[in-house]
Every structure is written in structure tokens, then in C-alpha cells.
Amino acid sequence: PADAFATLIGESNLVVVTGYGATGANFFDPTVPPFLNTLTSIDEGFGYWVKVNNEVTLSAEGVSLGGGFAKDLAAGWNLIGYWLENSQEPADAFATLIGESNLVVVTGYGATGANFYDPSVPPFLNTLSSLDNGSGYWVKVNSAVDGFTYPAAGLARQIASMHQETNPEIVKTNEFMFINGEVNFTDMDYTVGDKVEIRTESGMLVGEMKIIAVTDEMLDEFDDFPEFKCSLGDNLLMTAPIYGDDWTTEEIDGAIKGENLRFIYNDIEAELTIEYTGTMELAKVDLEFRFIPDAYALRQKYPNPFNNVTTI
């Protein structure tokens, strides 16, 4: 790592690098004695988390891995790179694993934060739409895979990305989980396209879910996913990340594992809470927001002023 990131280290821009392999998570911090670091090598086919102080384009020299490169996957989580030159959609990149019912989930991370792909949910609920050269991805599989390879991506083409608006109040960290679900509103107004806030016990905003209404087009997609039961006009909550605390900073900037999370819309809080896990996996919720008046009044019976008794 000291060689691979020498330029960043020389500019005092590198904070930390973490990797994940057969022995689990490992770590490199340029500010500590070398014997305290457990990440000792940057290896082909792997992905790495790199935290820097200032935005920078990282360049590296070497021989292209080529389309025939293969990498073993362990059962469970794997942090791997995408080594093909041309981008492709997750459904194509992992078609073999999906066909074998071996792929559980894929997560990525970009300019808008964390994104998510689950082959078992309708496509519109996924936010990871493209695998790109130079990026790394968390891939979870049920069973180990010997010699995983990406299929040929074909000609270079522009893949439509999933546009995600991000609230600057939310601190995007490398600790996160995902959430989606359904929502109902009772005795109150709401607007499709608004967002339900996800806050910690202390009130910190750590995520938002967009309210979407089920359309005819979505119902067509549900035909391939019989376990999903929805009707036209039902309100769903779009898949979104919930960010946890960044251990590299002194201040608390995200949810703490085990902490209860609250859901708020227009200052009204849902009764349901969930626990923050930070496992990168998906939680599902069924929220209900209900307007409950906090003030009542009795008014004079009218237009009969001669009757001094009113029955309620």
C-alpha cells in the first residue's frame, strides 16, 4: 500500500485503506508504524476502500487483467474489483451466479453514496445500475465460487444510471445498511415524491426514503416476483442507504450499531422503529403515519339557542 498510494501519502491526502480477503478485514494507515498495519499488499481482482481528505483522481500503472481473468469468491461477502474495460448492468455481470441462485446481493459506492442490487426484488427497487471499470463492489454469495469471471461486456455503451438525490445533511460513510418497504397515511396529507426521514435517537439524519406510488409498469415487473403483493396506487418506499458512524473520525457522524432508528414525515413520527445493523444488507419496513390532533374544543350548539343541553 505504501507504494501504490505513495503520491497520496506524499501529499498528506491518504487517511486509511481497508481491504477484505480470506482472513477477513485488513487495514493500512500511513500515520502508524508499519507493524500495526494488517493490509500488506494490493492484489489483482480485489476491491479496496480508500479514504482521502480531498477529492483526487487516483492513477495507477500496470498490465490490464483482461477479460479472461478469474477470481475465487468465498461464501459470504467478497470485496472485488470490476476489471473489464466496458461497463455492464449487474444482471448481466452476475448472470451465471443469478442463474444458479447463488448471488445474494451486490453493493457499490459512488458520488451519491451507497447503492444496492438484489436479484430477488423487482428492478425498480435496485439502485445499483452499472458496474464500471476502476470501481470495487461488495458481492455476497451463498456458496464459494472457483474462478469467477465476468462475461464479455460487448461494445462500450452508456448505461442509464439511477439518479439519486442526496441530502447534504446526511454524512455518507463506509458503514451502512439498506432499507425499503411500504407506507400508509391516515387522516393526513402526503405527496408522492416526498421523502421519509430516518433519524437516530439523538435526532441525527442518517437516511431518507422516497415515497413512490405503484404504477401499471411496476405491476408488470411484479409478475416475475410473486412474493411481492402490491396493488395499483399503493405507496412504496424506495430502497435507500442508512449510514453508520465513521470510525476514522472523532465525532459521531452516523448511526451506532444497535441504536434504534426513527421514521418521520412532516414532523409526524411512525410508531415503528428498527435497529441499525450496519451489515450492508436490506431491512424491510411497513410504516404507518397517522395524524392525531393534540387539541379539542366544544362550541355552542347552533342555531337553537333555547336548548341549553347538548348530547355528545
Walk through the language-model features, giving the residues of each.
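N-terminal exported-region signature
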Residues: 1-176, 190, 195-286, 291
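Structural beta-strand segments of beta-rich domains
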Residues: 175-181, 308-312
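Structural motif
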Residues: 180-190
